[in-house]
Amino acid sequence: MDMLIYLAPICALIGLIFAGISYKNVQNEGAGNDLIKKITASIHGGAMVYLNRQYRAIAVFVVFLAIIIALILPNGALTAACFVFGAVLSATAGYAGMLTATIANGRTTNAATRGIGPAFRVSFASGTVMGMSVVGLGLFGLSLSFIILESVYTDLDLLTIVNIVAGFSLGASSIALFARVGGGIFTKAADVGADLVGKVEAGIPEDDPRNPAVIADNVGDNVGDIAGMGADLYESYVGSILATMLLAASTAATTFPNIPVENVILVPLIISAIGILASIVGTFFVRTNKTESSAIHMAFNMGLIAAIILTVIASYFVTSMLLGEYGLNVFFATVAGLVAGFLIGQITEHYTSYDRKPTLRVANSCQTGSATNIITGFAKGMESTLWPVVIISIAIYIAFQLSGLYGIAIAAVGMLATLGISLSVDAYGPVADNAGGIAEMSHQKEEVRQITDTLDAVGNTTAAIGKGFAIGSAALTALALFASYGIAVGLSAIDVMNPNVFIGLTIGAMLPYLFSSMTILAVGNAAGEVVVEVRRQFREIAGLMEGKADPDYGKCIAISTHSALKEMIPPGLLAVIAPLLVGLVLGPGALGGLLAGSVASGFMIAITMSNAGGAWDNAKKYIELGNFGGKGSDAHKAGVTGDTVGDPFKDTAGPAINILIKLMSIVAVVFAPLFM
C-alpha cells in the first residue's frame, strides 16, 4: 500500500496538467473581431463578478461551520481542516471551469467562421478543462488528505482517519449546494426574464442584442451549467470514493476476510486514478469534421465508450491484484455501476431528445395550447422515473449480492470513474450555447450561425444526459453514505414500526418537496424582478427596439446576482440544519429514516423535474424548426410557456435535489458521534 497509494495523487496531477494544456489550447485560439471581443468580455465580466461574490458569501458559511466542527467533534481540528480543504478545491474547480468557458465562447464563434471542426475542437477543449479539473482536484485532495493523516498521525486507526477525511467530502458538498442553488436561480431568473419579455411580449428572437437580459442569460449558462454542474459532480465523485473508503475501513474484516484493510481502502482510489487516465485517452477519440449533429453525438460516444472499456479492463487487474479471490466480485460490482450510469444517460436522452417519441408527443400537444403542453410534459416526466429506478435497483441488487454494502459504494465509484470525460462532454454544451448567442449578437453570417446551432443542439442533449447521470450517481452515492452512517451509529435496519423512525422517514420524504418549492419560488421572485427591469428599459430607452440605442445589460446582471445570493441561503441552511435537528431530537434511528425517505422521494422528483423540463425545452425547439407552424405560431407560444415553466424544473430545483440528498447524508456521517 505504501507505494501504490501514490498512484492516486500522481494520476490526479496528470489530469490537472491535461486541464492546463487544454486551457492553453483554448487561450491560443483567435478571440475574433472587436464586437465578438466586446460581447465575450461582458459575459466573462458578469460571470466572474457573480462567482467572486458567491464564493465570498459561501466563505462565511464555511468558516462558521469549520469552527463548529473543530469545537464539538472528536478530532475536530483535523476534520475542520479537511472540510476547508475540500471546500477550497471545489471552489477552485468551479473557478477554472468558469474562467475557461467564458473565454472559449467567443473563440468558438470565431472558430465557426472556419468550419464546424475548429469550433467543435475549441468548445470541447473548454469542457475538458472543467472535467479534468473536477476529477483531478477531487482525487488529489482526497488522497493527499488520507496520505498525510496516515503518515503523520500514526496513533490513529484507519477508520478514524477515514472519518476525519469525511470532512473533505462535507466541504465539497457545502460548496456544491450553494453553487447549484445560487447558479440555478441566477441562470433561470435571467432566462425566464429574457424569454417572457423578449420572445413573448416584444416578439424579438432569442439572443437578440436589443434584449436587456440577453447578456445575463448568457452569463447564467456558465454560472448554472459550468460552475453548478461541476460542483455537483465533484461532490458525487468525492462522496462515492469517501463512502467506499468508510465502508472498507468498517466492514472489510467481515466482507473480505484475510484481505488487508489497506487494500480494500485502496481500490476506489486506484480505480478513480485509472479512470482519469482512461478519460484523457478517451478525449482523443472525440473528433469530427462533419456537420450533422449525429456525427457529433457519435464522436462523443466514441470517447465515452473508449474510456469505459479502458476503465473496465484496468479495474479487473486492480481488483484481482488487491482483493485476491474477492476481486472478481468487486470487479462486477464496479461494472454494474459503469453500465447503470451509461444506461441512465440513454434513458434520459430518450425522454428529452426531439427526435424521440416522448418529446414529439409533448410538441404535438402544444397545438392545443399551453395547458395540454404542461399536462403532457409533466406526465412524461413522471413516466420517465420507471427505467432509471429499475436500472439503479438492478445495479444495487447485483452489487450488494456480490460484495455487500461495499459493493454498492464501489458501484457508485464505477459509475463516476470516467467522470473526467463525461463531464467534459457536459461542460461543452454551455460554451456552444454561448457561442450561438455571440454569433447572433455579433451579426455573423448564416452559415456560422448554422454551425453554432448544430453544436448547441448537441449541447442541449448532452446537458440533459448529464443531468440524468448526475441524478443516478447522486442516488448511489447517497445510499453508500447512508450505509456508512448506519454502520457508524450501529443501525442494522430501519425499523418503520418505531414512531421516531417513521417520523424521520416522513420528514425525509417531505424535504425534497419543500426544498423544490423554495428554489422554484426563488426563481419566480428573481425572474419577476428581471421582467420588471426589462420592461422598464423597453419602455424608457428611446430607440432600443429600433436598434438605435444600447440596453443597460449590467442592471439585469446585478439583479440576477443579488437575487441568487439572497435566495440561495434558506435552502442551503435547510440541508444542514434538518438532519442535525432530527438526529439530536429524535435520535440516530430517526435520522436514518430521514436519509432513507429523502433519497427515495428526492430521486423521483429530480428525475421528473429534469426530464419534464428537458422535454418542454426540446419540444419548443422542435416547433422552432418549422413544425406545427414554426416560430410565432400559437403552438410556438405554448411551447415557450412550457419551456419557461420547465426552466426552474430542469436547471434549478431538479439538479439541486441531488446535492440535498448527498449533503444531508454526509452531514449525518460527519456528525454521527453527536447522535450516539
UniProtKB/Swiss-Prot annotation:
Q: Does the keyword Cell membrane apply?
A: yes
Sites binding Ca(2+) sit at D617, D643, D647
List the transmembrane segments: 3-23, 58-78, 83-103, 129-149, 158-178, 241-261, 265-285, 303-323, 327-347, 390-410, 411-431, 469-489, 501-521, 572-592, 593-613, 656-676
Q: Which reaction does it catalyse?
A: Na(+)(in) + diphosphate + H2O = Na(+)(out) + 2 phosphate + H(+)
Provide the binding site for Mg(2+) 1: D191, D195
Its top-level enzyme class, in one word, is translocase
The record's comment on protein family reads:
Belongs to the H(+)-translocating pyrophosphatase (TC 3.A.10) family. K(+)-stimulated subfamily.
Q: How does this chain assemble?
A: Homodimer.
Q: What is this protein called?
A: Putative K(+)-stimulated pyrophosphate-energized sodium pump
